[in-house]
């Protein structure tokens, strides 16, 4: 077997593992939970603005908070091979709780 054929064969066998690993990382339950909360908060912010409960300025601040939290989640995941630890999740949830309370005022 030539070196080129061996390299091609190796690439074929490694591709499925990479695809599976990427899918696992993307859909990791802790990441999904945090990101679903961010998405839900953005929907709540939109609803509160429509109902006149919060101003557009307040909404902008709240969305910026959510964007920061999402950025932290991405950074944490990149440090831990595509997932976040329970400690990371706890810290992110505390931040999300604070933002959630501000939405509900």
Protein language model annotation of sequence segments:
Residues 1-20:
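Classic N-terminal secretory signal peptides
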Residues 29-32, 47-90, 94, 98-101, ...:
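Surface-exposed, polar/charged faces of alpha-helical domains
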Residues 17-51:
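Immediate post-signal-peptide N-terminus of mature secreted/exported proteins
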């Amino acid at each position: 077997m030539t070196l080129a054929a061996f390299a091609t064969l190796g690439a074929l066998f490694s591709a499925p593992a990479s695809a599976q690993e990427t899918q696992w990382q993307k859909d990791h339950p802790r990441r999904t939970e945090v990101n679903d909360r961010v998405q839900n908060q953005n929907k709540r912010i939109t609803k509160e603005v429509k109902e006149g409960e919060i101003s557009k300025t307040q909404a902008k601040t709240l969305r910026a908070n959510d964007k920061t939290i999402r950025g932290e989640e991405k950074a944490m995941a990149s440090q831990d091979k595509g997932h976040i630890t329970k400690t990371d999740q706890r810290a992110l949830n505390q931040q999300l709780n604070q933002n959630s309370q501000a939405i509900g005022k």
